[in-house]
Amino acid sequence: MCIRDRELTVPILNGRCLPAVEIRTSESFYNFNAKYVNKDTQLLEFILPNNKKNELEQICLKTMDVMGCRCWLRVDLLQDKNNNFYVLEVNTVPGMTSHSLFPKSAESIGLSYNDLVNEIINGK
């Protein structure tokens, strides 16, 4: 089975999901070229109805729990045409560069880079 509809990521910080980010690229997946070379890659707020947003967050928090993770991580997923979610991978040390998804999501809710780093360090 090949799922090619929507690629997204959900950062989790101290037990709470930050806004999901949808990744749109002309590449076949979010690879090095899509991240750093291509100018057409878009990182968009992933808009969902409340019931699907709650489902997505529960999947991500359950994934965190099953993996035994805490503090911070990022869950990468696909969503198919029937709106089902599939976990691709868990990033236990998400990127923190200017191109990285975790700080971009935090920024979208007004959490500065410095505040984000402090929350990660202090675990609060």
Task: Annotate each PLM feature.
Residues 50-124:
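ATP-dependent carboxylate activation and anion-phosphoryl transfer catalytic cores
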Residues 3-51, 79, 86:
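Phosphate-binding site of ATP-dependent enzymes
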Residues 1-3, 120:
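Extended hydrophobic/Leu-rich segments
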